[in-house]
Swiss-Prot record:
Its main location: membrane. To M.voltae FlaJ. To M.jannaschii MJ1286. It holds the Pfam family T2SSF. It is found in: Cell membrane; Archaeal flagellum. It comes from Methanocaldococcus jannaschii (strain ATCC 43067 / DSM 2661 / JAL-1 / JCM 10045 / NBRC 100440) (Methanococcus jannaschii). This is Flagella accessory protein J.
Amino acid sequence: MVIVVFDLLPRVGLKPRDYLLRIVLPALITSIVLILLGFMLFSGIILYIYLLLPIIILVSAIGYPYIALDSQKNKINERLHIFITKFGTLSITDLNRKDLLKILSEEREELGELAKESEKLYVLTDKWGRSLAEACRFLAQRTPSSEFADFLDRLAYALDSGEELKEFLIKEQDIVMDDYAAFYKRMLYSLDMYKELYVSAMTSIAFFLAFSILVPFLLPYNFVFMATIALFAFFAVELLIVVVIRNRLPFDRLWHTGEKPTETDIKLRKWLIISVILVVILLPFLLWAKYIVGLSPFSQMPYMILVALGFTPLAIGGFVALKEEEKVKRKEFVFPDFLRSLGDSVSAKGGGMVSSLEYLSNHDFGPLTHDIKRLYKRLALGIDSNKSWRLFGFDSCSYLIQLFSDIFSRCIYFGGDPKTAAEIISKNFRKIVQLRKSKYQNIQQFVGVVYGLGGGLALALFASLGVAKMINDLYSSLSIPETVIHILNIAPISNVDVVEYIIFGSLIVYSIISAILIKIMDGGHKFVSLLHFVAILWICAIVAYITKLIVSQVLGVSVPLY
């Protein structure tokens, strides 16, 4: 196994010395320190559970080349659609093969790992004097992605057969896009797996939280201490799941990556600031009215509803962001039609880009029409073509439109045929949009699961708390000798309300992390998570209050319900 690990190091760009000194040695030292601390601080079953941590760290360090190689494979596959579209459209220009590879190797932001693979092809052909076919075969044996390796093998065979690069890449579009579609569908399957993982983890943590509420009646542990430990464990597990899912999901963002904020970005920030200001004003006022001055009707409101009401203004910024996100999706839906129409019009008029845009700007392309008119005005004023198209992509707020409109403009700039370029880009773009529809449906199911799970957590935790309060009231009403109290650990607990606040705090943590996770999985705008946070928090608050009300009636616990 050691030999296999060292054989993989060159493929992930590591020397054996760097691997041992930068990864294995720090992991080994950390594991030893953790093991020593474990033997000093813990014993029994807790020690065995704790020792899993240094073992995981050490195994991860040893298996780092496998992890890095798998990560490279995913990063290559997730950009295949961009690579084949850019490669195909640029191949119909006047660029020679070396210049084409050089351009691809410089697109680090757009192509990621595929830019590095293109750089290897460029170095092999330019510096080492290899033919493109030989370079493709050499790289196909070393790339971690089987899909990309198959593409390189097909390219090498076509070039050896005397086929033109342009003709091959135009025919290859459907094949590579089918490979990308298969990869995307596997990603959707992994989303289902992550949903199951999240539900299982949250169910287990809910059981642990419920157990931590009742265990002080059975074992000599402090009530508040157990609840606090459970809260931190809850937070740590949720955060770990988010990190794992974020690192495993392929890159598929919706929003643009422009450095300067667009009008839409400024609008969203304005509404976010308004929402935050309202929360800063409303939440302290509600708490002051209830707990300090006892102002009616706030003093009679349950604190769960009060907190949810205080955070509700955040939904304003989230709702505005959701509307803009839906508008971006509609823009992506009509973009292929616009580009195909533009390509046909420019080709028919013999290269009149400005006149074609003037004609198309009078047609209805939904929410994209405004951006098309701005593009026409920029080009009519003589602004640089590439810059105008780049600004068009940013104004659309769509990452896909940003990328593919830039590909189209560069193809035209280098002398490519507008009609052919538009056909390649629009066809591939349409396939990506169709794949995304499946993902959005999958995410909607996950949103329903998260909302329902929030209610389930609130029900389980506050039901357990109601039982704990009943037992506590029972012990308080009994005259038990002090000797028996110390033997059986049945002393009444005086800080039950603190534990209740800690439990509700765990539901707030769940609402925050779940809302963030939803946007990580769908790749949308992060501000929309505010709307999900408020919705989940309201569900948790309402279910918690109703559960507390029902438990108090069923078990006869005389506790204040507000």
